[in-house]
Design a protein with these regions (language model features):
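Protein kinase glycine-rich loop
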Residues: 47-53, 58
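Conserved N-lobe loop of protein kinases adjacent to the ATP-binding glycine-rich P-loop
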Residues: 62-69, 76-80
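AlphaC helix of the eukaryotic protein kinase fold
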Residues: 84-117
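Activation-segment/catalytic-loop signature of the eukaryotic protein kinase fold
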Residues: 129
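Conserved short submotifs of the Hanks-type protein kinase catalytic core
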Residues: 133-147, 151
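Activation segment signature within eukaryotic-like protein kinase domains
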Residues: 166-167
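Protein kinase catalytic-loop region centered on the HRD/HxD motif
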Residues: 172-182
Length: 219
């Protein structure tokens, strides 16, 4: 594992201890799919909204056949997209925004493909990706522990041993992707979730960049 300035990581996490994690707050969900909406011909059933950002809505859902909880992220640019309440179809009302939305949707799909190719216990796992309702979705593990940001807001300053454990796990994830010429570029407490075993898991590769062997950016 590369040398890590643990004091700098801890300072960074503490500096962000008031940041609100988008997951679990259920805000800004006026354009979200309704509870009990189904996707992929009933394969997935929406249970509720976990959060919404500028580029997507995150849902808690059930994978019906396997009887398990999953997280589904839907591409939805809330400033540029509309949803038909009856059909759930997503549209772009302004013709001038169509190309912009298409470009960012392609990036959303690329993000999912990037994560799906990774295999590290401290990086979120993606199980499925599909298009429906005029937009794109990908399906991830559901992690019930909330984010590192949530943890600090709830419990206050972490014990040193706990903080160092999370830092080492995040560093392991970063070392893994750096070895594959990927930079995450958006590591912060709200992008580190805690799984059911108390381990840190890195999410949200929306700003990530991939480089070739010469150091030139490829995505």
């Amino acid at each position: 594992m590369p040398y890590v300035r643990y004091d700098k990581f801890r300072e960074y996490f503490n500096r962000h201890n008031k940041e609100t994690n988008e997951l679990g707050k259920g805000k800004n969900n006026m354009n979200a799919l309704k509870t009990n909406a189904v996707l992929q011909n009933g394969k997935y059933c929406i249970e509720g909204v976990l959060g919404q950002g500028g580029f997507g809505i995150t849902y808690l859902a059930s994978q019906v056949a396997l009887n398990r909880k999953v997280t589904i992220k839907e591409f939805f640019m809330k400033e540029l997209c509309n949803r038909d309440e009856q059909t759930s179809q997503v549209s772009v009302p302004s013709m001038g925004s169509v190309d912009t939305v298409a470009r960012f949707r392609a990036k959303f799909v690329k993000e999912a493909q990037t994560i799906a190719a990774l295999n590290n216990p401290h990086i979120i796992h993606i199980h499925d990706i599909f298009e429906e309702n005029g937009t794109a979705y990908y399906v991830m593990d559901y992690l019930s522990g909330g984010s590192l940001s949530d943890l600090v807001l709830r419990d206050g300053v972490l014990a040193e041993a706990t903080a160092l454990g999370y830092i080492r796990q995040v560093a392991d994830a970063l070392s893994y992707i750096h070895a594959r010429n990927i930079n995450h570029l958006d590591i912060k407490p709200s992008n580190v979730l805690i799984d059911g075993n108390g381990n840190a898991v890195v999410i949200d590769f929306g700003l990530s960049k991939r480089y070739d062997e010469t150091g030139s950016q490829t995505s």
